[in-house]
Amino acid sequence: MRQALPLVTRQGDRIAIVSGLRTPFARQATAFHGIPAVDLGKMVVGELLARSEIPADAIEQLVFGQVVQMPEAPNIAREIVLGTGMNVHTDAYSVSRACATSFQAVANVAESLMAGTIRAGIAGGADSSSVLPIGVSKALARVLVDGNKARTTRQRLTLFSRLRLRDLLPVPPAVAEYSTGLRMGDTAEQMAKTYGITREQQDALAHRSHQRAAQAWAEGKLAEEVMTTYVPPYKNPFAEDNNIRGASTLADYAKLRPAFDRKHGSVTAANSTPLTDGAAAVIMMTESRAKELGLRPLGYLRSYAFTAIDVWQDMLLGPAWSTPLALERAGLTMADLTLFDMHEAFAAQTLANLQLLGSERFAREVLGRAQATGEVDDAKFNVLGGSIAYGHPFAATGARMITQTLHELRRRGGGFGLVTACAAGGLGAAMVLEAE
């Protein structure tokens, strides 16, 4: 094992995560229909600051992410600063790392804290799958640009006369990987076939996720970390995730048809995470700054790792690559963990990564490591359910996982937790957290 890389400032301060909050997550076109991601981000950051009672000028940086970009608000981070009453001089910039976007935001704030350029910052992300940037065809886009430069009405009419009816149709956002043309679900199907993951195994994991999430809500475990929201026309509050199917049975999952490989597939809408709207954020500080403000941190960031693999085959294996690296940098092994939380993009992807984490052959032949990362104990794995149940607003999921894991560690008396996610482009992310 290589030497651990401690995440501390020059003064030896640990990186503290003081608090975290999210909106309830809503299925596409339901509770947050028509609410853009920037407004969801303002909601969660505004409420997070109000609850924390931290002086507004104490926050020196905000790093926020958005995967489904909105052309009218390209820097969502700065818009949140301007729309929440934060100090207008607060540094703010936006990041995007697909489904690991808020992992990246947290890492960036941590690096600013370690560099000593700030003492407190906010990291997070928001996405809306209900407010989408609907584009135009390439032919129409070219004519619009050329028409803007045309000098006469006749020239403009000539340009538009070249268009066909199909050129006028709206173009929805791409759902496939740009470099391969493969959808995420196609990759999940690849992984199910490569690693021999059955439909029954996938449905069982999805059912487990929903049951555990429903239980977490019923026991009040999420109440402190999920805000109540009010959206136009402001008649009814929205306080709980609306994707969780607590009353479902395994027989219900078996009824659905494959969504991607219609003939031979096993990936369905029920064993995949749905399109979702929501936002999440965390407040981060140096340990000494938290003490100055009289705050007890939720926990600390012990290590993080980002990895990348090829996109043509089984590209959602990021957790199998990033987990051993994050553990190594933390100076820990799988056995040292109290909790292990993995983003469930698809049940097939989740099960494939779990399989490879325990594989000696994968460790030796692919990772070049002497031994497997380690089997994940089911008693430590996604103990409150995962993304299949809660939903997945792309840029918000990492911050949700971090906050949720730290709260659960505190309930268990402290310890170490690892959160990890796959992401489009063959990317992976993992972070080791510590609570006392």
Swiss-Prot record:
Name the catalytic site residues: C99, H392, C422
Q: What class of enzyme is it?
A: transferase
Question: Could you tell me the EC number(s) of this protein?
Answer: 2.3.1.16
Q: What superkingdom does the record give?
A: Bacteria
The reaction(s) catalysed by this protein are: an acyl-CoA + acetyl-CoA = a 3-oxoacyl-CoA + CoA
**Pathway linked to the protein:** Lipid metabolism; fatty acid beta-oxidation
Main location class? cytoplasm
A GO molecular function assigned to this protein is:
acetyl-CoA C-acyltransferase activity
Output the PANTHER family linked to this UniProt entry: ACETYL-COA ACETYLTRANSFERASE, CYTOSOLIC, ACETYL-COA C-ACYLTRANSFERASE
Q: What does this protein do?
A: Catalyzes the final step of fatty acid oxidation in which acetyl-CoA is released and the CoA ester of a fatty acid two carbons shorter is formed.
Kindly give the HAMAP family that the UniProt entry links to this protein.
FadI
Similarity section: Belongs to the thiolase-like superfamily. Thiolase family.
Designated name of the protein: 3-ketoacyl-CoA thiolase
Q: Which organism is it from?
A: Salmonella paratyphi B (strain ATCC BAA-1250 / SPB7)
